Each structure stands twice: as C-alpha cells, then as structure tokens.
Design a protein with these regions (language model features):
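Structural and coupling elements of P-loop NTPases
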Residues: 1-693
Length: 693
C-alpha cells in the first residue's frame, strides 16, 4: 500500500544502550499485527537486530528501518544503536526523520545516551517525544525520572501519560488528555476507575494546560480565564508545541507486556509532524539555496542516509525521498559526482526483509540495490533540477590500531574488504602507513573495531589481528660536526674515487637542506648532485634507532677527485661515509610526534582530564567553552601516550566527552625513554650494520 506524505511519520528511536529501543520497535510491529510473534533481544530474534553480530552481542550495531502500518498511518521507525561505539546509526537515521523518540528506561532513568539523543534532536531541529519504558517493573520510578528529565532536557518536558497502580498492584496508565485510566490484558486496553495519585494529578493537568496555552495567544487567554481546553484544543496545541520545539511530550508503558502502546502510536500520529509540510533546504548546481517541497509532482530528489555492503548481494542504499518519487529504471544524477545512476526496482524494507514496490513516494523511505557511485550522504536527483542536500558530519575515529594478517596472502584482500565496510560505516577509516609499513584502521572504540574484525572474517573470509600502531619517530642532531668521507676502491681497470668534506649542523624545519661552499675545483660541479643524493640517502636512517633524520643542514666544503676513477656513485658513497662519521659526534637525538589534543568534556570532568593529560607527559594550553555546553581542553600530548585515551575519556565522562587530535610537530624524546625506543627499533630490524656502528 502506498501512503500519502501526510500519513507518514519518519521517527528515529534513540537512547542509551539497554533502554528498550529495540524491544519497543519489536513491540510496535507485533502490536500492529505485522508479526505473529514478538522477538526478543536476549534470543537474537528481533526484526531490527538481524545482523549476526547483533544477535551474538544482543545489541544494535547499526540503524535499522522498521515500518509499522497501523490504522492508515505508516510509521517508518529507525531503530538506532545506543552503544557509543556505534553512534553513526543515530547520525544516519536523524537525517531521514522528522522526529526523534527518546527511549528512557523506567529502571535506570535518564542516562547519558538519552541526553545525547535529545541534544542531537534539538541540534538538528527535530520534533522530540519521550517514551519511558519498563514502567510495570517494581523498581521503576517514573516521577523521579520525570523530575530528572526536567533538569536535563529543560522546561519543554510535558507528561501526557503517567503510570499508577491499582490496589492489587495491577499497573494502569492515566491519559492526561482524556483524564481516563486504562489497564491492559493481553495487550488490550481496558478502562478502569481513575486511581488516586494525590496532589500530583491536578499539578500534572495544570502543567500540561500551561504548556499548551503558551503555543497560542487565544489558548493563553482561555487558560488565564480559567476555562478548560477541549480535547481538540489540547491535541492541536500540543502538536504545534511539539513542531515548534516548545513541548517534549512524555509517554510511558511497557513494551514487553504490550502496555500503553496504543496511546503511544495514536499520539505519534497526532502530535509528530508528517513530511508533508516539512520543506527541506538544499543547494542547486550554483551553490544557491533552493527549497524542496514534499510533493510527488516535483522533480525527484532522494537522500542516501545509509548503505549496507554485502559481498554476495552487493550494495543496498537506503533512501529518504525528499520530493518526487523513485521508480524502477529512472535515471538520477548523483549531485556529488555528477554521474548518472539508473534505479533498480525500489524496495521497501522491514529489518532484513526486502519487498519490491512500484515506487517510493515523497516523504517515504525505501531502498535501491546495486547503485554504482552512491554513498551515504549523497543526493540523487532528477537531471532537470540538480540539487545537493547537506551531508552529515559524522564523529571522527579516535582509536587507531594496526592490522596483522592471520593468513599469508590475505594482505591484498584486506584493503578491498575494508573499503566495502567503509561504505556502510562512515566512522571507520583505513590507511596504509608507508613509513611504518602498517595498515591502520580507525574507529570509535574497542567494541567498534572488534565488530569490524568479526565482519571481515564472517563477511569476507579475512582473518586479522589488531595491535598498537608503531610510532613514526624521527632523528636529528643538536650540534655541528665536520667530517671527511673518502671512498677509494681499486678492483682492476677503472677504480672508484670520491673525497668530500661536509659540515653537518642543525637547522629549523623538518627537512634535510644541502648547500655547497666549494672554492676552486676540488670537487667538480657535476658531482654536486651526487654528493647531495648521498647525504639524502644516508639521512633516511639515523644512527640511534634507524629513523629518518630531519632538521639537518649539510654543507659541502671541500674534497678531491680523480680524473679517471671519480664517478657519481663514488661521490654518493663518500657523502654517506662523511655522514656516518659525523652523526655520532653531532649530538644525535630521537624526536617524537606531538599532537594537539582537543578534549570536549563536561565541566565536572575537566580536572580529571587535565590531570590525566599531565600524566601522559602532556601540556595543557588552555580551556574554552564549546557550543554544546561542554568545556574544550586544549593540550599538546606525545602521540605515544594517547594509545588508550579513547577508553579513558569515555569512562571518565560516562560517554559525554569526545576528542580530536592533530599532528603539531616533533620534539626531542626524553632521555630516559630513548633506550626503549632503540630496543624496539632493533626488534623491528630498523638498525642495520651501518646504523649500529
């Protein structure tokens, strides 16, 4: 069945890990009649957690699209992961949704994941609703959670359904709109007498009425006149308040036991915005702003919000149709690449189940298989109106590990397999470090990289190990030293002869500088390039640990030559000998990379973070507030000391903090750490005979 845009609700379900998001999604599917039985996260049988790794870990690892059709309305639910290592799912899903349903556990309350989901919704201008799950449990404390929500989410929080209990302990739910109470038997609603919850009831009604009154001048007059609002006025005022970000309605129930889900679905329909009047701002081919309206009569424009890479089926692109409609065989332009993509048969998706559709209309969500160039964040549009929607900014990788191959010969497979995984995971990075000869992958945490490792094995048959990346050290000198290099060899016939005197000294910058100050013809000019080449080749390995030498100035001062035996190779060798003789006497040092660290953390954690930076041999340069209400600590820290900083900042801030690093410069490695670095270089084979002598 095809739905008009006013009968569609695109909703991201987000919150902390374990708050009940996937169970709620599963319960809504079951409640709507789309499933014969309700799957369980514990059993790995839910519709949205269909990836083998999700079933194994009993947690969502990526955003999953689950449409629920109920009483003529299509709810495109996007179940996002709550684990911070997989928060890319929230960033993907929020771009396809008009609304965010923040799931809060009635047992554990407003945890960090709920706070971050709420902030992400607000930052992206999305309508927000809260569902407090597990309210039928003994230790659930709805009203304490409600007060905590008001502190953390602000004054927009407005309870609409509250839990209570009958004398026999039966859970009931009070609908504050209708001021009626209901219990549930086998998921079916049964009205009961309104239980006595004391002074709270009147306070809740007044608070809701005041919130509604603030959405409209006429309603405000009626409120101050002491008149009660009609049901229609309550719903309309609430709807407007939600759309404008003035009200965050709070509902509650039990997903596992099918309690109060009917009230949640009804109000998601009535209160949350449809795509119909939700115009989207894009850029045309000239970079000028253009407004896209949600109408099938408009030229087609669709946004790729998620990609799944499958080694057997191929690539599956999840699309939110912004305007027009998607049909099989249509040719759409990728606004990023300029390439034309031919659409295959449009698909509707329910977890892993795919069903062919005639078309996907404006405002709806679907998928298309085997697009060639499209990737997450791309806009596909009709050639008559090329537009580009803003691409999301995903969290950057913060934990980097080196890849080791379990089976010889798999080295070549790794890069292609990781490239496929990077198509579906924008927070994953991969590079070949030419200096350390290691393949480096980056992710958001240990769990993230562990899942990548498992997917490489299960999806692509490539088994890898992970280890700490090697540090790309440098070497330099602290004082000047002048030495002669003389290469003479007679092997019969023409011999080899080259003789140079070179002054080596420190210089600014991270390069090797060569000059010549030769007077007369002691070294002919045509051999100067050979001398320079010899110096540069020698400087590729320092004398302490075999690392490249930087900040070195070599000046050719004198030398001699033989009219027959001198050659370019002879002068290259002579320059190397001069280098080898001079460097041990020039105060050689090892340099380590220093990175600029920007740690964004709550104010309460600044002391702990700055203390830890100091322990890591870092220097705190300053602190400034950022736009998200966090404090940004700016510091410089040796790269070698940042190995487990991802885990530390997450544990210290309970997941609220994050950080970025950027290379700043090289500095001299403290003397006490030099032996360990030299020994490591020896084990790696950096030290050849010439470097050891």
């Amino acid at each position: 069945m095809k739905y008009a845009s006013n009968n569609i609700r695109n909703i991201l379900i987000a919150g902390h890990a374990g708050s009940g998001k996937t169970t709620l999604t599963e319960a809504l599917v079951y409640f709507s009649g789309a499933a014969e039985r309700m799957g369980r996260v514990e059993d790995g049988t839910t519709i949205s957690d269909f990836d083998p790794e999700e079933a194994k870990r009993k947690a969502s690892l990526s955003a999953s699209v689950v449409p629920v059709e109920y009483e003529g309305i299509k709810y495109n639910l996007i179940d996002a992961p709550g684990l911070f290592d997989f928060e890319a799912g929230e960033y993907e899903g929020i771009r396809a949704a008009e609304s965010v349903l923040v799931c809060v556990s009635g047992r554990s309350g407003v945890t960090v994941g709920a706070e971050k989901a709420f902030q992400l919704a607000r930052k992206n201008g999305k309508a927000t609703m809260v569902f407090v799950s597990k309210c039928d449990l003994e230790n659930a404390n709805y009203f304490k959670i409600l007060e905590d929500m008001k502190i953390k989410f602000g004054a927009t929080v407005c309870p609409c359904v509250v839990p209570a209990k009958l004398d026999d302990g039966t859970p009931v739910y009070i609908n504050l709109f209708s001021q009626k109470a209901f219990k549930y038997e086998g998921g079916k609603q049964v009205q009961v007498d309104l239980p006595d919850i004391g002074h709270r009831f009147q306070g809740l009604i007044e608070a809701m009425s005041e919130a509604i009154a603030e959405t409209d001048d006429e309603l405000m007059e009626k409120f101050f006149g002491g008149e009660a609002f009609t049901t229609e006025e309550i719903v309309e005022g609430m709807r407007k308040g939600v759309k404008d970000g003035l009200i965050t309605p709070v509902f509650c129930g039990s997903a596992v036991n099918q309690q109060a889900l009917d009230m949640l679905l009804y109000n998601m329909h009535k209160l949350l915005p449809s795509p119909e009047h939700n115009s989207v701002l894009a850029e045309d081919a000239n970079g000028e702003p253009v407004e896209l309206t949600c109408a099938e009569s408009e030229p087609a424009a669709a946004y790729v919000f998620k990609t799944v890479a499958d080694p057997f089926v191929g690539k599956l692109s999840y699309l939110r149709v912004v305007s027009g409609k998607l049909t099989a065989g249509a040719s759409l332009v990728n606004a990023r690449t300029g390439e034309t993509e031919k659409m295959g048969k449009p698909l509707t998706v329910l977890g892993k189940k795919q069903t062919e559709a005639e078309s996907i209309g404006a405002g709806d969500i679907g998928a298309v298989a085997k697009l060639v160039s499209a990737k997450t964040g791309d806009t596909l549009c009709d050639a008559s109106r090329v537009v580009k929607l803003p691409a999301p900014v995903f969290p950057k990788p913060s934990l980097f590990m080196a890849v080791t191959v379990a089976k010889k010969g798999d080295e070549g497979k790794i890069s292609s397999a990781l490239a496929r995984l990077m198509e579906e995971d924008p927070t994953l990075s991969y590079l070949n470090n030419a200096e350390t000869h290691q393949q480096i992958i980056g992710g958001l945490g240990e769990q993230h990289l562990d899942v990548v490792k498992a997917k490489l094995k299960n999806k692509f048959g490539v088994e890898i190990g992970l280890e700490a990346p090697r540090i790309a050290y440098r070497e330099s000198i602290r004082k000047a030293c002048q030495k002669q290099g003389r290469h003479k060899k007679q092997t019969g016939g023409h011999g080899q002869f080259g003789d140079v005197v070179i002054n080596f000294e420190p210089c600014d910058g991270e390069q090797v500088v060569f000059e010549e100050k030769v007077f007369g013809g002691s070294v002919p000019k045509n051999f100067f390039p050979a001398v320079e080449k010899g110096v540069r080749l020698a400087a590729e390995k320092g004398v302490l640990a075999g690392y490249p030498v930087v900040g070195l100035k070599a000046t050719l001062l004198d030398g001699s030559y033989h009219p027959v035996d001198s050659s370019e190779m002879a002068f290259i060798m002579a320059a190397k000998l001069a280098y080898k003789a001079a460097m041990p006497e020039a105060g050689p040092v090892i340099l380590e990379p220093i990175h600029t660290l920007k740690a964004h953390v709550p104010n309460d954690n600044t002391g702990d973070i700055m203390g830890d930076v100091t322990k890591r041999r870092g220097r705190v340069l300053g602190m400034e507030p950022d736009e998200d209400g966090l404090q940004t600590i700016i510091a410089e820290v040796p790269l070698a000391e940042l190995a487990n900083f991802t885990t530390f900042i997450r544990q210290t801030t309970q997941g609220r903090g994050w950080f970025t690093t950027e290379f700043a410069r090289y500095e001299i490695l403290p003397e006490m750490l030099v032996p360990a670095v030299v020994e490591q270089a020896r084990k790696l084979g950096n030290l050849d005979e010439s470097a050891d002598d």
